[in-house]
Design a protein with these regions (language model features):
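Glycine-rich phosphate-binding/hydrolytic loop that grips phosphoryl groups
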Residues: 97, 225-246
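Short, aromatic/basic amphipathic alpha-helical patches
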Residues: 66-73, 214-224
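Glycine-rich phosphate-binding loop signature in dinucleotide/nucleotide-binding domains
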Residues: 106-108, 194-199
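Active-site rim beta-loop-alpha module in soluble metabolic enzymes
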Residues: 137-197
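Gly/Thr-rich phosphate-binding beta-strand-loop-beta motif of the actin/hexokinase/Hsp70
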Residues: 1-29, 103, 110-131, 147, ...
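Phosphate-binding/catalytic loop of phosphoryl-transfer enzymes
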Residues: 76, 81-150, 181-190, 226
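Short glycine-rich phosphate-binding loop at a beta-alpha junction
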Residues: 53-62, 198-209
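N-terminal glycine/serine-rich phosphate-binding loop of ATP-dependent small-molecule kinases
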Residues: 1-85
Length: 246
């Protein structure tokens, strides 16, 4: 469906992520609530919580789910070319683009967004709302799960509430140490490199693992972690910027 050139009062934002559906309920420009659901295999029925058949503004990184939701009666798919963000490249993930757009709207530019989801991504924009670039690597849980799935003897391990010993003396903690400490070192390096170019920039942490990752950062590198801001809704705030322009 083509973008509707009318102002929306009540509308739903839907971000289709790699692991889940992320929803937001807007009344005008106000984000009333946000929630997550599992991916669906069919169009939702009357039991699914879409209030009053509202318009859905959708962004997606999962093509199969995009195709499913395009059959909904009132849906608009948000694409890169609709974003007021300069310097984007064709394969940039719409989630990353919306996140850095939303972070800039709320927290100011320049800004670096770290999204701790299935993938761990870094995305930065300068003061002119131009994409500087970023990086992608497997997220914390994906790294842990990959070791369990692709090796014969290593167990599936969960993220600990607190940092494991760096030099572990058992296999579960050794896996936690290897994954977590190398990710933290990488995050520190990226943030420090960003601050060299943009010393006044905010660092925004979002995504499903944002809280536990921030706690690790604040423990291991408090001089970094204590300056990181968490915001779970910046993708939806980026959507709001796009929808407001319709």
């Amino acid at each position: 469906m083509e973008p509707q050139r009318r102002k929306q009062n009540n509308w739903l934002g839907l971000m289709i992520g790699n692991s889940r559906l992320h929803w937001a309920q807007f009344v005008g420009k106000t984000l009333e609530k946000a929630w997550d659901t599992d991916h669906l295999s069919t169009i939702p029925n009357s039991q699914f919580p879409i209030p009053n058949s509202q318009s859905i503004y959708l962004a997606s990184v999962v093509p199969e789910q995009t195709a499913l939701w395009q059959a909904y009666t009132d849906v608009c798919v948000i694409t890169l070319d609709q974003l007021p963000l300069e310097g984007v490249y064709p394969t940039l993930g719409i989630d990353r683009a919306l996140a850095v757009l939303g972070a800039g709207e709320v927290w100011g530019l320049p800004v670096l967004v770290i999204d701790a989801g299935t993938a761990l991504t870094f995305t930065g924009a300068d003061a002119n709302r131009r994409l500087v670039g970023g990086a992608i690597l497997p997220g914390l849980r994906l790294q842990l799960n990959s070791l369990a799935q692709k090796t014969a003897a290593l167990p599936k391990i969960e993220l600990p509430d607190k940092l494991a010993p760096r030099f572990a003396r058992n296999t579960p903690q050794a896996i936690q140490s290897g994954v977590i400490y190398t990710v933290l070192a990488g995050i520190k390096d990226f943030i420090q490199a960003w601050w060299q170019d943009f010393p006044e920039s905010k660092i925004i942490l979002t995504g499903g693992d944002r809280a536990i990752l921030l706690s690790y950062l604040q423990t291991q590198f408090p001089e970094i972690g204590n300056h990181v801001i968490t915001d779970p809704n910046i993708i939806f705030l980026g959507m709001r910027s796009v929808v407001s322009s319709y």
